[in-house]
Amino acid sequence: MTIRIAINGFGRIGRSVLRALYESGRRAEITVVAINELASAEGMAHLLKYDSSHGRFSWDVRQECDQLYVGDDCIRLLHQAEIQALPWRELGVDIVLDCSGVYGSREDGEAHLAAGAKKVLFSHPGTADLDATVVFGVNHQQLEREHRIVSNASCTTNCIIPVIKLLDDAFGIENGTVTTIHSSMNDQPVIDAYHHDLRRTRAASQSIIPVDTKLSAGITRIFPQFVDRFEAISVRVPTINVTAIDLSVSVRKAVNVNEINALLQKSAHESFRGIVDYTELPLVSADFNHDPHSAIVDGTQTRVSGQHLIKTLVWCDNEWGFANRMLDTTRAMAACGF
């Protein structure tokens, strides 16, 4: 049975989800029946076709009134500001992928359900009272039919959680710190402008900018045993895509670099195939653009201090990798039944 989805919010993640669906050959499994976005239909079509990070879309795109054509597929375009006004029941929507970045509460999810959707998947962490928060490859097997309002966590949570699990299972993590080196985002100005966060008043292209992050909360939502044992900071850097995460953990078992890299490399080919990748090539952030993995471990940067302190560097395309996991989680939710 084909899964009928709607995309609410057609920004960086929403467009990446649609492009990933077509580029990954999953159209036989998932059909996009509608997209809701306040922007103009013309602008939606243009930004789908031409993308500064991911290049020109390989599929033919055209727009006629409030219909978007991708190849021969027709997708209805909506411009509703209120969830309650969305025609999900009329369109037979199975799962709404809410990529707006605005909504994320249980109340928001229930509004989508009241509008006729059978299930909802948020593209960011959401509130703690959702039915489930999923990091695909780590805990998606815990999804149940009754889980109707689900979060796909965040791009950085999806990146670091598999690596934390691997290190903890093998060596026993005592505690850890995480530094996210994140590309610029659309809440930063091109030139200095007002913002409630004074650091984010500054031009995105001119500085490395510390910002608040809830990544430590994201880690403990998936692994509650690490409450009060992980801390995280984040800086934004003047690139438009791809993120690096510096993970440092103290472990109980004495280890060396070769043991760590052997574990991570093996997992990339076996238990986490398609989710985690591993490289020892001398690559830079641009080389991971459009990479569909949640995490790419850079084995050249693995370090051990005193046999118990591990440092690793993990890359991710914070747009494309996450968009692919949205599709994976969508399939997993549908497989549980409606």
UniProtKB/Swiss-Prot annotation:
Subcellular localization, as worded in the UniProt entry: Cytoplasm
Recorded catalytic activity of this chain's protein: D-erythrose 4-phosphate + NAD(+) + H2O = 4-phospho-D-erythronate + NADH + 2 H(+)
CDD domains listed in its UniProt record: GAPDH_C_E4PDH (cd23937), GAPDH_N_E4PDH (cd17892)
Keywords associated with the record: Cytoplasm, NAD, Oxidoreductase, Pyridoxine biosynthesis
Active site: 155
Domain of life assignment: Bacteria
Site feature (Activates thiol group during catalysis) residues: 182
Annotated GO biological process: pyridoxal phosphate biosynthetic process; pyridoxine biosynthetic process
Major place of residence: cytoplasm
GO molecular function terms listed in the Swiss-Prot or TrEMBL record: erythrose-4-phosphate dehydrogenase activity; NAD binding
GO cellular component: cytoplasm
Functional pathway: Cofactor biosynthesis; pyridoxine 5'-phosphate biosynthesis; pyridoxine 5'-phosphate from D-erythrose 4-phosphate: step 1/5
Pfam families: Gp_dh_C (PF02800), Gp_dh_N (PF00044)
UniProt-annotated binding residues for substrate: 154-156, 200, 213-214, 236
NCBIfam families per UniProt: E4PD_g-proteo, PRK13535.1
Similarity section: Belongs to the glyceraldehyde-3-phosphate dehydrogenase family. Epd subfamily.
Known role: Catalyzes the NAD-dependent conversion of D-erythrose 4-phosphate to 4-phosphoerythronate.
Quaternary structure note: Homotetramer.
Name of the protein in question: D-erythrose-4-phosphate dehydrogenase
Gene: epd
